[in-house]
């Protein structure tokens, strides 16, 4: 079975494990997390990141928040005269932007972990650098394209390799947008309630795409785990 979930934003790792247990998730199954496990709440998602390092049947697809964290990876470099000299206004702006987007809680958790186990922080950053921008999967007799945000400025017939990286992590689809005719695109990034109050806590399914972001970034709303094989939803 193939499962997807997105935009956990600091969701407690123990609650995620409970949710997976509720779905009957086992070693023969596969879970795709469609970006944004970090920032905003709790431990900033660092617990999930540590867990991911040892999961062979779970894959994080890069989200815009992971991309922002990677842009701030210089914070975990060894402090030298050169690194101090390189800390310019551009890096300050990158850091400020990340903090404005809820990155403080993740940076604090990583800083604490860096004192205890700097090699683990290095492993986390390396893991994030290797995360794919998208995945193409077939399950339950259907083809799916999985990414964080949908596809910005989508053009039918355009090669996926011709899109810039930001197209898969910073898109804000309109409800009437369409993607592939024969492949369902699954993403998060835009909380479904942003499309109207009638979609609050509900997955949106259109002819060509599915949005599974329930808005857990608020720290109160529960995320949804979707099993693609039969479209059954699981929640805590």
What name fits each language-model region?
Residues 4, 31-33, 60-61, 145, ...:
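Residue-level marker for buried hydrophobic side chains located in beta-strands
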Residues 10-12, 39-41, 67-70, 188-198, ...:
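Active-site environment of divalent metal-dependent phosphoester hydrolases
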Residues 7, 35-36, 63-64, 189, ...:
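Active-site glycine-centered loops adjacent to acidic/histidine catalytic or metal-binding residues
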Residues 100-211, 215-221, 231-235:
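Acidic, His/Gly-enriched loop-helix segments that form or flank divalent-metal centers
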Residues 17-18, 45-46, 73-74, 158-159, ...:
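Short amphipathic alpha-helical segments
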Residues 45-48, 53-135:
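Active-site neighborhood of divalent metal-dependent phosphoester bond hydrolases
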Residues 1-49:
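N-terminal active-site segment of His-dependent metallophosphoesterases
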Residues 1, 26-28, 55-57, 141-142, ...:
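A general structural motif
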